[in-house]
């Protein structure tokens, strides 16, 4: 089942007249469109992609099952023409309430008068369970990240900056087919490792530093996400102790992933283990999130998440400990939820790596 079939099945199940899409992520997922200007109308049995001259040919090639319509001056006028030409005169349409700007919504309402009602749909939930073709692309993205990280490790040297390491890592991903980094690459060393999202800086990497790398590749639009923490030279007893706690919590989290578990149940597996070893406030972010066409998607694993995981969802498992201004670390894998467990997407070694030893 492709994105369009999935969406039309949903429209019928929800007894909607149709949906209106403008979010580039949803246009990619449900139509295959990767241009920057598009507007899709999908009904129970028809689909239209509205775009301008720059993307008409592209949309014709990408948007299987859609009638591609080029607008000249006004998207809204073209929308009205589509409705009139196809005898769509009233009904209930789903819109992207979390994405659609207020002015666009108001224009949509004004343009269509009072003929239609609108309801907000969380399309991210529709994208949460991945199709097999998506999973294959995500396996490829994850492998790019794994291979790039393996290529980085022998190049790490005391005296280089975090940005030097970032450039090497991102270059290795690009060499292997990544379109771009999944997000601003995190390289946090020494006392900066206590910052969960410490993006790479010009800090010099020193002997004895923990270095946390949180990064990902993008392959055909799909993201990977992985975190590993290494130490420059021999690890101290404190580093070994903290690392062993986080590693065990992370392994327990991965082992707990399965269809039927909730986000807060998974979170508790990691959080309780860390708390029982004396660290509560030092682990103060969620345990995981979904990944796909966006780096942060449904589902989530945090203390408040009642989301029940389904087979073929993606979830990260990424506990950490952060001692403010001193030291920190995180270990993260992305996994595919299965009926009785999970499939690892990321395979880089998780035992503590001492660089240069």
What is each model feature region?
Residues 1-357:
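Active-site neighborhoods and metal-handling regions in enzymes and metal-associated proteins
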């Amino acid at each position: 089942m492709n994105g369009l079939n999935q969406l039309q099945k949903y429209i019928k199940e929800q007894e909607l007249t149709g949906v209106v899409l403008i979010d580039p992520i949803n246009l990619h997922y449900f139509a295959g469109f990767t241009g920057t200007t598009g507007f899709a109308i999908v009904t129970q049995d028809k689909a239209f992609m509205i775009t301008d001259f720059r993307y008409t040919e592209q949309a014709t090639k990408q948007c299987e099952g859609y009638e591609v319509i080029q607008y000249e001056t006004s998207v809204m006028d073209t929308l009205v023409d589509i409705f009139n030409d196809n005898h769509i005169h009233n009904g209930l349409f789903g819109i992207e309430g979390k994405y659609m700007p207020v002015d666009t919504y108001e224009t949509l309402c004004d343009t269509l008068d009072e003929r239609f009602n609108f309801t907000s749909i969380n399309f991210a939930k529709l994208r949460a369970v991945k199709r097999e073709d998506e999973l294959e692309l995500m396996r490829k993205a994850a492998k790019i990240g794994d291979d790039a990280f393996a290529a980085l490790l022998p190049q790490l040297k005391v005296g280089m900056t975090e940005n030097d390491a970032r450039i090497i890592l991102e270059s290795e991903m690009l060499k292997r087919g990544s379109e771009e980094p999944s997000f601003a690459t995190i390289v946090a060393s020494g006392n900066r490792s206590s910052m969960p999202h410490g993006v790479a800086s010009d800090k010099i990497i020193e002997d004895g530093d923990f270095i946390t790398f949180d990064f990902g590749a993008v392959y055909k639009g799909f993201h990977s996400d992985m975190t590993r923490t290494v130490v420059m030279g021999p690890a101290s007893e404190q580093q070994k102790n903290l690392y062993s706690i986080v590693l065990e919590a992370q392994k327990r989290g991965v082992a707990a992933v399965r269809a039927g578990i909730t986000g807060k149940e998974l979170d508790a597996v990691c959080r309780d283990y860390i708390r029982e070893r004396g660290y509560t406030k030092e682990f103060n972010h969620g345990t995981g999130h979904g990944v796909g066409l966006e780096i942060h998607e449904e589902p989530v694993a945090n203390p408040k998440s009642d989301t029940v995981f389904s087979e073929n969802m993606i979830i990260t498992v990424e506990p950490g400990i952060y001692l403010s201004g001193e030291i920190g670390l995180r270990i993260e894998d992305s996994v595919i939820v299965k009926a009785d467990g999970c499939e690892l997407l990321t395979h880089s070694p998780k035992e503590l790596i001492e660089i240069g030893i």
